[in-house]
Amino acid sequence: MAKVAGFRFELKQLFHLMWPILITQFAQAGLGLIDTIMAGHLSANDLAAIAVGVGLWMPVMLLFSAIMIATTPLVAEAKGARTPEHIPVIVRQSLWVAVSLGVIAMLILQLMPFLLPILGVPESLQPKAGLFLHAIGFGMPAVTMYAALRGYSEALGYPRPVTVISLLALVVLVPLNYIFMYGIGPVPHLGSAGCGFATAILQWLMLITLASYIYRAKAYQSTQVFSHWERINLTLVKRILKLGLPIGLAVFFEVSIFSTGAIVLSPLGDTLVAAHQIAMSVTSQLFMIPMSLAIALTIRVGMYYGEKNWVSMRLVQKLGLATATFFAMCTMSLIWFARPQIVAIYTQDPAVFDIALYLLLFAMAYQLMDAWQVGAAGCLRGMQDTKGPMWITLIAYWVVAFPVGTYLARVAKMGPAGVWLGLITGLSIACVLLLMRLYRNNHKLAQQS
């Protein structure tokens, strides 16, 4: 009979996993900030070209790297089932999938410059944005393989190596950007393309560093991934893709809906778009907290799922959602009491300032729903239920949130408030449906036992 986990023990385990993951998320966001700051010192044209390139690269990168999240619940399940011999096989096959997906993503990014005229990107930006996409695309195989190894390390309960590498990447990116963007010695001035090359090189360096650490560190020796290689196992590859593709699409649906607000509002003027982007930037930073908790929940739930310890699994879920509630209340309080100070970091323009201040009230309103829905999604991934959540996110965000937000913003003349009401509606529906699905899955498992 499986031993039931204690409340304090499980809370400690969640925080042990969550905090390094949270630091990793902030460090990765810092990489984008460094690119923006250094590109801004080149020229406004270079900065705009990189912004366009990142806008196209980011969805592709998130889609393909999110597919590799499947490694996490599979490794956690094998750990919980006490079958460590299965773990290296899972990771090796995940790396085969990662290489294949990385090459596909790289080819997509090489072709993307041809879409720039179709997307209405100004001719003045097309050459530099195209070169940026060509350059950064070479890093995609490293991105997907790194995601697979990261999932393996975190699922074993070792998130700190990834955190340290992410923090080191912040330090390394500055000189890399300087060398390739501004030129030094034999390296010519490459401008925005140099930013893409620097990021791609950094991604390969991060992969090599993590792989080297996993190869050498004692903690991984019992499940040594690199002891030998093996051929592609189509059965396991299909299982990885069956689990991972819905995760990737769900992440894509969620991320893309939040990036459409600026497009919907663009005909209504720069001031509204700027205010909307400020509010969106604030919520994106705050979202890293429940997202990091959700990754920790996937690991702990996945372990108990493999162990078939349903009582402890439900305890983790309840504890995770309670923790998500606590953090949501904290972020709501932060927004309520510090709105003026937060907006002042972004702008001093009076018109933009007032609208952003108003929009942060909508951001505050959905913190709880957002925390619950991402927490429930993390639990479901741990239970290897990914197809249902994919359809839920598609319906909630693109069948409901997008049309409702567009109608309220443009037809009902509500402007950015309409977009945010649409997002709140979609998030609320996703939250309710994901929690219902989690309850249903738990009820089924309870009946089976």
UniProtKB/Swiss-Prot annotation:
Residues annotated as transmembrane: 17-39, 54-76, 97-119, 129-151, 164-186, 196-215, 243-265, 280-302, 315-337, 352-369, 390-412, 417-439
Pfam families cross-referenced by the UniProt entry: MatE
GO biological-process terms attached to the record: monoatomic ion transport
Entry keyword set: Antiport, Cell inner membrane, Cell membrane, Ion transport, Membrane, Transmembrane, Transmembrane helix, Transport
Bilayer topology term: Multi-pass membrane protein
Keyword flag Signal: no
Tagged with keyword Cytoplasm: no
Localization: Cell inner membrane
GO molecular function, one term: xenobiotic transmembrane transporter activity
Domain of life per record: Bacteria
One GO CC annotation: plasma membrane
Function per UniProt: Multidrug efflux pump.
NCBIfam families per the UniProt record, alphabetical: matE
Similarity comment: Belongs to the multi antimicrobial extrusion (MATE) (TC 2.A.66.1) family.
PANTHER family (alphabetical): FMN_FAD EXPORTER YEEO-RELATED, MULTIDRUG RESISTANCE PROTEIN NORM-RELATED
Protein name: Probable multidrug resistance protein NorM
Organism of derivation: Acinetobacter baylyi (strain ATCC 33305 / BD413 / ADP1)
Lineage of origin: Bacteria, Pseudomonadati, Pseudomonadota, Gammaproteobacteria, Moraxellales
Encoding gene, per UniProt annotation: norM
